Amino acid sequence: MAETPYSSAPGTATSQTDDPGAAQTPEALRTPTKRLSLGFILMLCLANVALWFSMQPVTNILVPEQVDRFDPDPSRQIFYNGLILFGGALLSVFSNPVGGALSDRTTSRFGRRVPWLIGCGALSAGALALMANANGIALLFIGYGLYQLIVNGALAALIAVVPDKASEQQRGFVSAFVGLTLPVATVLGAVVVGLLITNIQIGYYILAVTLVVVMVLFSLMLHDARLPRSAVKPFRLGEFLRGFWINPRQHPDFGWAFLSRFLVNVGWNTTVGGLLYQYLKYGVKVSNPAASVAIAQIIAVVMIVLSSIVGGYLSDRFQRRKVFVIVSAAMIAVALLVLALVTSWTAVLVAAVIVGLGFGAYLAVDLALLTEVLPSANDRAKDMGVFNIANALPGAIGPLAAGILVPVFGSFQPLFFMATGVVLLAALTILPIKSVR
């Protein structure tokens, strides 16, 4: 018999859950127990790569290059770049949890996630086309904002697939591979857009087409369970809005996990995560910043691949999450400290190795930890969307703060020292989590 994406491993029970009440629980809301096939995991990874591939080079390369062409003044470039990223990230703070909550309530015959993957994927492609034809800062600002508003609807649906489909015993393994997709997509985007394609418009169009095609292919394979209308509470705006508040006193582990991820991203996005192009151009003074971004990211991703797979495997093997997250966050802090102490291309390469080793394990194991502290199975996409604020909000305030502070300080170094301390604090906030070892 042909293997399905959710076929059980030999000897695994075929029932969806051991809970006697499972028969009354809609399939879409049951806790998964079946092992995912390798084919499905790879397709899930491809979908994540395509989504991040459409996002990362836009933020890291295309927008900075467009700003560079629109305004030659270095100080204004850093400010405008930060302003554009701030506007888009601020909208993503709103759209990701709202999109996730609406996805959780979707009762389409195609399932809860598929309509959002395909619909938002297609609309995101349109926003990319708008940015490709921007003729100034204002239109670029509008286009980037629209893009972030829409694409985060697809992201909210896609990140919910892991808790939707992966059993607790397999989440570390699946999360390790899914965690790899961000750095892989970042390097792929840097190589394609930063090295191979020098035309900005063509770069945008490649990202748009790739996103739409892969979202459709993954949706065809997803077999997304339909949520019965009877399982959805009547929509009440006040109750819907209150649902976005997850009380950290009632769910302290979720709160600590949120704070840790938030602090890691503040440290990262205030420095190289939001200003790598400008740092290499004006701090290190490389001759080709776009190519240098690609080289540094390629080195980092090689390390990320190794540490993500090893970290995810060991985390599952020993059923430990916290120690891996703490150590990996500390390694990210060490990489930022290297850049704070030494301004050179060699230091960038050394930091790329260290941060790759740290981020790989961090992305893999922290995602696995998160799926184990979600408050409710009924609201996985919404809760993941709320958690994604810890990714999106630093993406908003980090580049803007850096764009203001770098001209004040006169250099990038003070930011790197501040970021090092923030990321070390992020490692410590994992310690109070009690429900996960």
Show which residues each predicted segment covers.
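Structural signature of the two symmetry-related core transmembrane helices
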Residues: 113-129, 323-338
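Multi-pass alpha-helical transporter architecture, strongest
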Residues: 132, 214-223, 417-437
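Helix-loop boundary and gating motifs at the non-cytosolic
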Residues: 26-89, 253-285
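Helix-to-loop junctions at the C-terminal end of transmembrane segments
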Residues: 95-110, 307-320, 406
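Intracellular juxtamembrane helix-capping segments at the cytosolic ends
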Residues: 63, 153-166, 362-375
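A membrane-interface helix-boundary motif in multi-pass transporters
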Residues: 77, 112-114, 195-210, 404-423
